[in-house]
Structure formats: C-alpha cells, structure tokens
Amino acid sequence: EPDFQDWLHKRLSGTSARWCQHLELEVTETLFQKVTPALQLTMQSLRQMGLTLAIDDFGTGHSSLARLHTLPFDKIKLDRLFVLELQAPMVRTIIRGMAHLAKEFERTLVVEGVETPEQQAQLVELGCPIQQGYLMQAPLPLAELLARPLR
C-alpha cells in the first residue's frame, strides 16, 4: 500500500515514541515478489519510527535468502510447516541453518507453530530459543487481551 506509511504515521503521531518500540509489523513473503527502492525506503522509515519489522511465514512462499540482506527486517518468523516436519533430518538441518543465518545477519529468528514441550525442546537444541505457538499462548480476543495486566 503506497499510503500505508503516512496512514500509520498519522495514527501514531499523538503516541509516545516509546510505544512505537512495542509495535511489530509482520509482513508476508508475497510482498517481496517485486522489491523496489520505494519499498525499501518505506521499510526503512517504519524502522526509524521505532517499529519492529518481521517477515512472516518465511520459507514457504516467495521468499528468497537474498531478501534477508536487502530488506531491513528485524525478525524472521519461520513458518509452522517446519515444526510439523521437525522429525525429518533434512528439516532439522534447514532449521539449524536458518538459526545460523539469522545470527550471522543479526536478525531474530522466531519459530512459529510450537504446540508441544517436545517441539519446544527440540527447537532449543537446534538453536531456536524464541518460539511462538499454542504452547505459549492461544490467540485471545482483543477485549480479553486488553483486560490482562501487563507483564
């Protein structure tokens, strides 16, 4: 969306800058079919506003390893399909490799779709301590989330 940056800036303009640091914008791989200078500038501007940028569902769509160094992402969110195939030796190698690449590119790797303690332990063993999924917290309605005390 060409006007997204302006729209978001207007919405956040009355907000303390420190709150922007708690916002994470997840972008799916399909956005990167055509990387343009305008897209790169928009992403850079969003980061300058203090937002964290995450590439969501990495590894299953139109992603390319080249995107990891050409676009200003803070996080790489590895798709849950890798967790579903965690017992396959090649998948374990891919996950271990992604953990290494993320570290080398100074990006945070988040593995999505973790549902069991066994998966959690295996992923930690593969170098992926940051995880997301039903094991940690099921999705909540917004009203219930807002009613919870901050930790």
Task: Name each region found by the language model.
Residues P2, H22, E26-V35, L51-R151:
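EAL-family c-di-GMP phosphodiesterase catalytic domain
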